[in-house]
Swiss-Prot record:
Superkingdom of this protein's organism: Bacteria
Ranges for region Domain II: 64-142
Coiled-coil blocks: none
Species of the source: Streptococcus pneumoniae (strain Taiwan19F-14)
Lineage per the UniProt record: Bacteria, Bacillati, Bacillota, Bacilli, Lactobacillales
Range of residues in the leader sequence: none
HAMAP family attached to this UniProt entry: DNA_HJ_migration_RuvA (MF_00031)
Region (Domain I): 1-63
Subunit organization: Homotetramer. Forms an RuvA(8)-RuvB(12)-Holliday junction (HJ) complex. HJ DNA is sandwiched between 2 RuvA tetramers; dsDNA enters through RuvA and exits via RuvB. An RuvB hexamer assembles on each DNA strand where it exits the tetramer. Each RuvB hexamer is contacted by two RuvA subunits (via domain III) on 2 adjacent RuvB subunits; this complex drives branch migration. In the full resolvosome a probable DNA-RuvA(4)-RuvB(12)-RuvC(2) complex forms which resolves the HJ.
Cited function: The RuvA-RuvB-RuvC complex processes Holliday junction (HJ) DNA during genetic recombination and DNA repair, while the RuvA-RuvB complex plays an important role in the rescue of blocked DNA replication forks via replication fork reversal (RFR). RuvA specifically binds to HJ cruciform DNA, conferring on it an open structure. The RuvB hexamer acts as an ATP-dependent pump, pulling dsDNA into and through the RuvAB complex. HJ branch migration allows RuvC to scan DNA until it finds its consensus sequence, where it cleaves and resolves the cruciform DNA.
Key words, A-Z: Cytoplasm, DNA damage, DNA recombination, DNA repair, DNA-binding
The protein's name in its UniProt record: Holliday junction branch migration complex subunit RuvA
Length: 197
C-alpha cells in the first residue's frame, strides 16, 4: 500500500491526473482533476489509496490526508464505491455532508450523485459521529469560497451559455473548474476542449 506519491503532474483529464515519479506515470483518479491545473509540470505530493480488483489495480489520489480519510469513510458504507465517493467529495460542500450525517438529513444526502434514500440512511447509520472535516485544505471548502469569488469562471459560463451550450453540460464543467483561478478566456478554451471529447 502507498501513503502518498511525490512527483510531477504531467497530464490532466476530466477523470484523472498523471503523476510521473522516477520515470513512471501513475494514473490517479481524483475528485476534481482541474483543481490541479495550476500545478502541471510542477512537483506535488498526492495522498493515494490503492484499490485492487480482478481486472484492474486503481489508484485514487487526494490533496490532503483529510480528504483521503473522508474517502475511506465513504467507501466503508455499503452501496458506495470509489467512483461514488469521489463524486460526493467533488460536490460543493463537504462540511455540509458531515453536518447532514450528524443531523440525519436524508434529503440533503440524496442530492449527491447515485445516492438514494436507502444508501443515505446507511451513511447516517455507519458514519454518524465518525466523520470530521478537520482540515482547511479540503478542495470542496476551497471550491465553495472560490465559487463565490470567481467572477472569471462565471463570465466564461455565461459566454458559453450565450453560444448555445446546454446549462446541464456547463454545470458539470463548472464543477471541474471550481477551486481554480484563471481568466475567462482560458476557462472557455479548456471547456471547449472538454466538450469536444
Amino acid at each position: 500500500m502507498y501513503a502518498y506519491l511525490k512527483g510531477i503532474i504531467t497530464k490532466i483529464t476530466a477523470k484523472y491526473i498523471v503523476l510521473e515519479t522516477n520515470g513512471i506515470g501513475y494514473i490517479l483518479h481524483v475528485a476534481n482533476p482541474y483543481a490541479y491545473s495550476g500545478q502541471v509540470n510542477q512537483e506535488d505530493q498526492i495522498y493515494v489509496h490503492q484499490v485492487v480488483r480482478e481486472d484492474a489495480h486503481l489508484l485514487y489520489g487526494f490533496r490532503s490526508e483529510d480528504e483521503k480519510k473522508l474517502f475511506l469513510s465513504l467507501i466503508s458504507v455499503s452501496g458506495i464505491g470509489p467512483v461514488s465517493a469521489l463524486a460526493i467529495i467533488a460536490a460543493d460542500d463537504n462540511a455540509g455532508l458531515v453536518q447532514a450525517i450528524e443531523t440525519k438529513n436524508i434529503t440533503y444526502l440524496t442530492k449527491f450523485p447515485k445516492i438514494g434514500k436507502k444508501t443515505a440512511q446507511q451513511m447516517v447509520l455507519d458514519l454518524e459521529g465518525k466523520v470530521v472535516v478537520a482540515g482547511d485544505d479540503l478542495p470542496a471548502k476551497i471550491a465553495v469560497q472560490a465559487s463565490a469569488e470567481n467572477q472569471e469562471l462565471e463570465e466564461a459560463m455565461e459566454a458559453m451559455l450565450a453560444l448555445g451550450y446546454k446549462a446541464t453540460e456547463l454545470k458539470k464543467i463548472k464543477k471541474f473548474f471550481e477551486g481554480t483561478t484563471d481568466t475567462a478566456e482560458n476557462y472557455i478554451k479548456s471547456a471547449l476542449k472538454m466538450l469536444v471529447k
